[in-house]
A protein has these predicted regions:
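Alpha-helical transmembrane segments and their immediate juxtamembrane flanks
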Residues: 257-281
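Residues at the starts of beta-strands that form the adenosine-phosphate
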Residues: 7, 32-33
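Conserved donor nucleotide-binding strand/loop of the catalytic core
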Residues: 46-77
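Acidic helix N-cap motif at the loop->helix transition within catalytic regions
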Residues: 19-22, 43-51, 93-94
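N-proximal low-complexity "stem/linker" segments adjacent to membrane-targeting elements
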Residues: 1-27
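Catalytic-site signature of metal-activated, phosphate-bearing donor transferases
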Residues: 66-73, 79-80, 91-255
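Short acidic donor-binding/metal-coordinating loop in glycosyltransferase active sites
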Residues: 39, 60, 78, 85-88, ...
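A conserved acidic beta->alpha catalytic loop
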Residues: 27, 38-48, 62, 85
Length: 281
């Protein structure tokens, strides 16, 4: 018999994740409710999510990872929430640790979780991801995601200790799909940098920053020990850096000619990207 614990909400944000969402939600089936926030997917993500009896399915335009996660957290009904991305899975050992922690009475308002990362079906042990950790177990009001369109930082009131058990992160199983994702992240990263006032000092940034990213992840962070998949993974990270800085440089050239860059849509009322001035009420 499991120990009595406070009620727990699972939280998942997604867009066109029909290949991932079912396994993600199955790993959260033990939660008392699951809030799924979908950014108007055009595949079967909504159909799959709605097939789970404890899922509350919501739709909202995507203004960034921080805005999505904060909004989804605000829709939960219980004191504690456990957040997953669609490409993540809660492992049985992590579930057991979370349930025991909640039953015993948590001493902190948020907890960090280690991630075991997989790329093209292979475990990534190094390549800059060896110590990958994310804040995912949150008491209501104890943490918020600082605004960033990609990979937002979590601002926690107090400490966020790391749990022993990891979650599994299946970053990508299709190489072409991953490259498209890196282009998208590069676009968003460039847009965020532009709003923050960041600019390329010269075209050298377009050349040397990706080269440094590869050297750092493959050499200094021991991506070489991940074998052939490590080379591919580190090259993809370098490509994302190239996409960001090449686009930022092209926008600077356009600005010099009097043309404004076409940035992704931004939620002016509810959220601000890192470095931006909050909109007035």
């Amino acid at each position: 018999m499991s120990l009595a614990r406070p009620l727990l909400s699972g939280v998942v944000t997604c867009f066109n994740e029909e290949r991932q969402i079912r396994a993600c939600l199955e790993s959260l089936a033990w939660c008392d409710e699951i809030v799924v926030l979908d950014s108007h997917s055009t595949d079967r993500s909504a159909e799959i999510a709605r097939s789970f009896p404890n899922v509350r399915f919501l739709e909202r335009t995507y203004y960034g990872a921080a805005a999505a996660k904060n909004f989804a957290l605000d829709q939960t009904r219980h004191e504690w929430a456990f957040i997953l991305d669609a490409d993540e899975r809660c492992t049985p050992e992590l579930r057991a640790e979370i349930e025991a922690l909640l039953a015993a009475g948590p001493a902190c308002g948020a907890y960090t979780v280690k991630r075991r990362c997989y790329f093209l079906g292979r475990a990534i042990r190094f390549s800059g991801w060896r110590n990958d950790r994310v804040v995912r177990l949150i008491r209501r009001g104890a943490a918020r995601h600082a605004n960033a369109r990609v990979h937002p930082r979590v601002v926690v009131q107090g400490q966020a200790p790391t749990l022993r058990s990891p979650l599994d992160h299946y970053m990508i199983e299709d190489f072409h799909e991953y490259l498209k994702r890196m282009v998208k992240y590069g676009h968003w990263g460039a847009a965020q940098a532009w709003r923050d006032g960041q600019r390329a000092s010269s075209f050298a940034d377009v050349l040397f920053r990706p080269a440094w990213r590869f050297f750092r992840t493959y050499g200094l962070q021991l991506g070489v020990l991940d074998g052939g998949v490590g080379i591919a993974f580190c090259l993809c990270q370098a490509f994302a850096t190239y996409a960001k800085w090449s686009l930022l440089w092209s926008w600077q050239l356009d600005a010099a000619r009097g043309r404004s860059p076409q940035l992704p849509e931004f939620d002016e009322r509810e959220e601000t990207w890192r470095g931006a001035v909050p909109a007035a009420e």
